[in-house]
Regions:
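Nucleotide-activated donor-binding/catalytic signature segment of Leloir-type glycosyltransferases, i.e.
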Residues: 281-302
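Conserved acidic donor-binding segment of nucleotide-sugar-dependent glycosyltransferases
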Residues: 355-369, 378-383
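Short hydrophobic beta-strand element within catalytic cores of glycosyltransferases
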Residues: 340-343
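Conserved donor-binding/catalytic core segment of Leloir-type glycosyltransferases
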Residues: 231-248, 254-257
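Short alpha-helical donor nucleotide-sugar binding micro-motif in glycosyltransferases
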Residues: 310-315
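Donor nucleotide-sugar binding/catalytic pocket of nucleotide-sugar-dependent glycosyltransferases
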Residues: 162, 177-221
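Aromatic "clamp/platform" in nucleotide-sugar-dependent glycosyltransferases that forms part
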Residues: 323
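N-terminal subdomain of nucleotide-sugar transferases
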Residues: 1-73
Length: 419
């Protein structure tokens, strides 16, 4: 149930321009507005709405010449797109044609058109600014803007900490000391930030990324398999996300899958991969070279929630072999659909599966294909055990990641720092 909003938050996602990230996954701005769901930002929008907080998304883009407003249809949120400044365009062009040190960092700082942003923040009646990442140039300039406009500035952690350039290092420390608060889901990252930047603990809040567990629920398994043309007696491990081989540990997953199939000859085993990305061509080559059994790959970005639920509902176990994450939503989607999870201990996973098997999953060391194979094999070999873990996973999703639970926590933290 939504509450009448009495607070408005400006949400600024990571990336210099809208097209920098979305072009790499084949998502046009029209598709973004009409169809895209599932990412952390939409979870925040939905969760905050349940707590009476309205969210306005802000992007910069080279595809508009004046501030333009749109509606994100699935959430109803306003999307305000600001034109990139001429100076940023010039620096961006130069970066493509030279290797001048520090120019890329300068471009990142210039990517946020502060004058236009200030005007649109006032127009929307925004009470606070929330940036996707605090170790990024946009956060630094937003803290400055917040001081000038007397607006509190917060930031989340979604996995994007970067190496500091000579320009960024002093700016970052100053911005973190002067921001209002940080929202971090993982205890490991909280400890790192406290150690590296010396921030007072009260400035940090441990709040998980939310998920609409009412919408993310399992379909009938047999019907899902029928739609996908998968035999009812096949055993399926599923993964979905961006195809980035090293970061997402897909090389580890392929090696683990090879072990699993070799140890279980004669069984109909399927590895269902859903997603695309910058390493798609390389992954195709690896799969062909390794001559792996039963790999089914939907090489596209799937933004249809019903279709994604169908893929998850057809599976027996979900796996996340990542080497690095921020706080991944994908395994929570699988848990909400009643799937047990086998995941590498990347940041966020020890928090999501805090109770281990009691939370509905198994955690293995990162980069360890043998350990991943053993854990996945254990789940695939034990039907009763896998069903029990799936029930626990669903309970964990409902109790810890629902919109209502997270929305209340977010509102309390944002309001506790209002002046």
């Amino acid at each position: 149930m939504n509450v009448q909003p009495d607070l408005t938050i400006a949400l600024l996602p990571w990336g210099d321009l809208f097209e920098d990230f979305h072009d790499t996954i084949g998502v046009s701005f029209e598709t973004f507005c009409k169809e895209l769901t599932g990412s952390w930002q939409f979870g925040y929008i939905d969760a905050l709405r349940t707590a009476g907080v309205r969210t306005v998304l802000f992007f910069a883009s080279e595809h508009v010449s004046t501030p333009s407003r749109f509606t994100h249809v699935p959430t109803g949120a306003t999307v305000c797109v600001l034109p990139a400044s001429p100076l940023h365009r010039a620096v961006r062009y130069t970066v493509k044609h030279t290797s001048f040190p520090g120019l890329k960092t300068l471009g990142a700082y210039l990517s946020t058109p502060l004058g236009l942003l200030a005007r649109e923040l006032r127009r929307e009646g925004c009470n606070a600014i929330l940036c996707q990442e605090y170790e990024y140039a946009r956060f630094d300039v937003c803290v400055l803007l917040g001081k000038l406009m007397r607006l509190p500035v917060f930031a989340t952690f979604q996995g994007g900490h970067q190496q500091l350039s000579r320009i960024e290092a002093p700016m970052r420390s100053l911005a973190l000391q002067n921001c209002t608060g940080l929202i971090i889901a993982t205890q490991t990252e909280i400890d790192r930030v406290l150690t590296d930047y010396g921030l007072p603990p009260a400035k940090l809040a441990r709040i998980f990324n939310p998920l609409d567990v009412k919408l993310w629920c399992a379909l009938d398994r047999d019907e899902a398999r029928g739609q996908l043309g998968i035999p009812l007696d096949a055993q399926i491990a599923v993964w979905h996300g961006r195809i980035e081989i090293n970061r997402k540990g897909l090389d580890v997953l392929l090696e683990a899958w090879k072990h699993i199939c070799c140890e279980r000859p004669g069984r109909d085993l399927r590895l269902l991969l859903v997603g695309t990305g910058s390493d798609a061509d390389e992954l195709h080559q690896r799969i062909a070279t390794m001559q792996l059994q039963g790999v089914m790959w939907v090489d596209e970005f799937v933004n249809d929630r019903t279709k994604m639920r169908c893929y998850l509902s057809a599976a027996d176990v979900y796996t996340l072999p990542s080497r690095h994450e921020g706080f991944p939503v994908a395994p929570i989607e699988a848990m909400a659909c009643g799937l047990p999870v086998v995941a590498a201990d990347a940041p966020g996973i020890p928090d999501i599966l805090e109770g281990g098997e009691a939370s509905g999953g198994l955690v293995v060391p990162r980069g360890d294909a043998k350990a991943l194979a053993l854990a996945l094999g254990r789940i695939l070999d034990d039907e009763a055990g896998r069903h029990e873990l799936g029930k626990r996973a669903r309970c964990r999703a409902e109790d810890s990641f629902s919109l209502q639970v997270i929305g209340k926590q977010l509102r309390e933290f944002l309001l506790s720092h209002q002046t």
